[in-house]
Every structure is written in C-alpha cells, then in structure tokens.
Swiss-Prot record:
Gene Ontology terms: cellular component: actin cytoskeleton; cytoplasm; nucleus; protein-containing complex
EC number(s) recorded for this UniProt protein: 3.6.4.-
Protein name per UniProt: Actin, cytoplasmic 1
Originating gene: ACTB
Family of this protein: Belongs to the actin family.
Stretch forming the signal peptide: none
InterPro entries with a match to the protein in the record: Actin, Actin_CS, ATPase_NBD
Annotated organism of origin: Chlorocebus pygerythrus (Vervet monkey)
Membrane-traversing stretches: none
Residues where Tele-methylhistidine is found: 58
Amino acid sequence: MCKAGFAGDDAPRAVFPSIVGRPRHQGVMVGMGQKDSYVGDEAQSKRGILTLKYPIEHGIVYNWDDMEKIWHHTFYNELRVAPEEHPVLLTEAPLNPKANLEKMTQIMFETFNTPAMYVAIQAVLSLYASGRTTGIVMDSGDGVTHTVPIYEGYALPHAILRLDLAGRDLTDYLMKILTERYGYSFTTTAEREIVRDIKEKLCYVALDFEQEMATAASSSSLEKSYELPDGQVITIGNERFRCPEALFQPSFLGMESCGIHETTFNSIMKCDVDIRKDLYANTVLSGGTTMYPGIADRMQKEITALAPSTMKIKIIAPPERKYSVWIGGSILASLSTFQQMWISKQEYDESGPSIVHRKCF
C-alpha cells in the first residue's frame, strides 16, 4: 500500500495499493478511452481484465518505470499537487541496497523536480508516532519485516534485523492452503487480491497454536464463511490462524529463519546490556501485518518465555499502527528542527544522488 498526504495531518489523504495494471486483452471498442496502464484503486477495480504488477518486492523497488507511475499518480491524481512546489519525505526499509536509495533520490529531483527531499527509516517513524524516543519497533508490512532498536532517538544499525517474510507471503500461503484443502483455485493476480481480503477480514493469531488446532478439529466454532465476488460462499476453518502462524513459525513457508518473536529477541540481545530493559518495556508493533487480532498477546507470551524471568515486558500495539509510519512522517516533516535536515535541490546538483547516504542516515 502507498500512503500519501500532507505534513501536519493526522492521517494520510490517499491510501492505495502499490500496483500497476496493464490490459491483458486487445481493446475492441473505439472511443472507450482505454489506457495502457492503471494505478492503485483503478487497477484494483479493473483487475479482472488486467495483469497486475507489483513494482516493490520485499521492500525493494525492482521496476522503476512502474514506481514512477505510482509516484506520478500520487502527486497528480491523489494529492493534486505540483511536486516542484513541495518538499517530499519518502520512507525506506532499513538494510535496503544503497542503489535503491540513490535512484529514489534521483527520480525525485530529476523527474519530479522537487525543491527538497528526505528519506526516513520506516520503523523510526513508527516510534515517533507512538510518542517515544526509546524502544524496539517490529515493523511488518507487505514485503518485509524488520526489528529496529532505537535508543534516545538513535537507531542502532548493528542490531537491526530483517526478515523477508511479510503480508504478501502470508497471502500466498493462504492461497496455497485454501487450494490444498478445498480445491478452490486462486491463481491469477486478481484472485490473489481476493485472498488478501479474506486474510485481512478473517485471520487471527492463536495464543496457543496446538490447542487452537485441537479446538478447530473437534468443533465448527472457529469456522467463518466468505462470499466470493461471483456469489459462491466458501468456509474457512483452521486456515484462519494457520496463515498468520507462519510469522511465528516460518518453517510453514519452508523458510529457515526465526519467527518474529525470536527476531525481536535477537535484535534486543544485539544491543548493549544496559539498554535492553528499556527495549523490552517498549516493544512497539507497526505495519499492516501486525493488525491480526491476538498478535500482541502472542508476542507478549513468546518474548516472556525467551527473556530473563524478572524482566518487565510490554508490547505496544497502537490501534492506528497500520498507518503509524505515515503518521510519524507527518510529525517529523512538520517539526521546525527538521527543516534543516532536508536535502535541497542545490545540494543534489552539487553532490549527485550519493548525498542521500550522508544526509539521511
């Protein structure tokens, strides 16, 4: 999802999927005003006749032409502003390739002629939004999950851990288990969007996975039904919690990595022993993939089991955490002290795209 708006606002003006769709078929009706590409919600609503492409994978932009289309759509259609008149704050997943940052910077200054821009780390913004300067943020979105410990406003880069398992992987996993169990076939890019909706509406995290599996096997109390766009009704049972369980047990997806609870714990353990107590007591969840009911209680339980027995552990799951990165950006960009941090067009012209590494991190 792309979230865009104005500094100082308390919520984004525009929230739309970061997708670009192109027609799968030849247009036959003259004067229909068919376009060669559609972005965001329009691509979503016409998805049945389009091939949908996601320019961002695992938090990294792979298709810059499509990314440019998304930004163009954001400025001109969603926000209706001239980019050359406004400084732009972008966000980035930590530990992304350096070239990714430079290319973003280059496009903003050269294609959109912005007067100034800045790239902030997503997790740091979530912490701002929660009103803290110290804590560990577990941020999980569509493409990437990362844990970022922050102390007195400084991110601790050596302790940042990244997990390439997030919302899109869970959607794919749900497609797979629904197909295996019920023979429903979800294959096209458009059908993936239906499964994403099922996931967002019906999935939850079990406090005790084994016990929940037993409950699901012995009664139908956990079953829920969902109506597909063609009117067919499907029923889903243990898939409701089996899908997000992969966050805690990535082996479900055939991945050898640690779950989000262990990754958070490992991140804390990479920090200086003196500050761990503050991190345990300020564990902040952010991003759309942390929106499952039950996830905070489960994190509390899992981290308590890993941490020293006397440690006070507090999981903070703000209700607006789906947008907390954006809200943090809105706060940051409106601070008077931030105004000297922007990279100006003049600085860019003097130093080129590499200026972003010096000024932003």
